[in-house]
Amino acid sequence: MISSITKENLINFKRPKFELKIRDIKDIKGDFVLTEEAKKRLQKIKNFFDSRIPVLLEGPTGTSKTKTIQVLCHVFKKKLIRFHLSSETNIGDLIGRVVSGGEDSWSSFRFVPGPFTEAFSKGYVLLLEEVNLGQNSVLQCMETSLDTGEINQDVPRYGIIKAKMHPDFIIVATQNPKIEGFTNQRGELSQKFLSRFTVVEFPTVEIDELRIIAKGIAEKNNYKMDDIVRKISDFHYQWIYKEEDSKSTKRGFTLRDINATIKAISNGEAPSDAVICFYGSRYKGKEFNHLLEILKTKYEGLYKNLNLIPKLPYDFPKCYSNYSLKKTFYFANIAKRHDRHLLIVGKEGSGVTQVAKWLSWYFTPEKKRKENFLFIVSPETTVSDMFGKFTPKGDASNFSSGITEWRNGPLTLTIKNGYSGVFDNISYAPAKVIESLNALLDPKDTEEDYYFEIPQNTVEPRVKIHKDFLFVATCSLSQMEKLSPAFLNRFTVINLEDQLEGATEKEEKEAIRHIIESG
């Protein structure tokens, strides 16, 4: 049954005379291109917005669901609040919670509205990402507010919170299909919840539209080699959708990869280097050679002989130099040049943690290298462990009196100061931690993108992302299936191969000597 507010909207629904034109999005940066299909979806969603009908965007990762809403809000000057749901999201995360008064405060506690309450009461657009990861109790709480037109929630240590729904409030949700292999964490939304939304499908982008998108991205980046751009789009489509072997490893490839590739070559990167890095770095052995063979035989100009990989730079940490390590550095260096974050993967015992530490150290500006750190992620890791929390100021007894101060976590220090660090075993992070990272790791196309919200920090909830910020993570190959495609596609994934494969006895002894000397 459709909620009362939606029923009223449907009764009064009249399609506004709205037609989005190219000039409306001329200042939108990034990978959004106004194809005919994108235009139809934008017009449809805008019409639902005008009638205040909740919208559910449904489709695979990387089909521009989020970007579509960002474009609409930008064009029509609507404030947008994004929130990623997870299996650990609770009602307090959405409605709000009581926090200590903050630094030097003697007022014990205060209520800080959550994203749902803020958007609901102020008439903003609320975008709920990955809504089918949310708990039923959280979804039911939102259902009640949509039904009644008000929030009436009991908040521990504070009392009843009440808020009326603003007439301009708009709610949008996204969901990705379960078939993407994200270890069954996606649930089925109830019919009762679904009935409140009008579904807009975002299908897989077909080859003709993909070519238009690639050409549009090239034009935005003033890259005029149409033949190369077409080859990139055709290869992207063939590799992801037409190759039969190991399709599970192709999870995570999206339009972001086309955007990153074209942007890199427009900034001077050789097309072969960009394509092999952004599409091939996660593979090894047979799969990697298969990718190279496709490029060599079908896409002239995108192939490169990787037997000619250069040596490690002279200022790289002292180590046993080998083909696997040189190849990993080669990919990491290209990715870093184009502001891509790094996920180093490999078999257990392959040295991914040590190599990630070396890369993190090398890519950190020299004056900041002493601040590098290793953060070992576990199933018990919390968002507060990563970003920070309020702690008693000075004496622990001050907590009960409200005298507290915010202490940044390692990730916040990295974000603000441009340090680099390694987040080891990232696949062990709880879903709530992973979902909190997605917006942080998004490509940065505008000045506004360089700000990140840390709602737990009521003293400084908005942090500027330093230009030197680099997120380096590790994961074992056997654990990659635990990471969502939405998370994977924010990284250049680099597969560290066996560093002693094919080594001579002399080379093995050299490797052992380096291990002993490094402690």
Question: What feature does the model see in each segment?
Answer:
Residues K286-K298:
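Interdomain linker/hinge connecting the two RecA-like lobes of the SF2 helicase core
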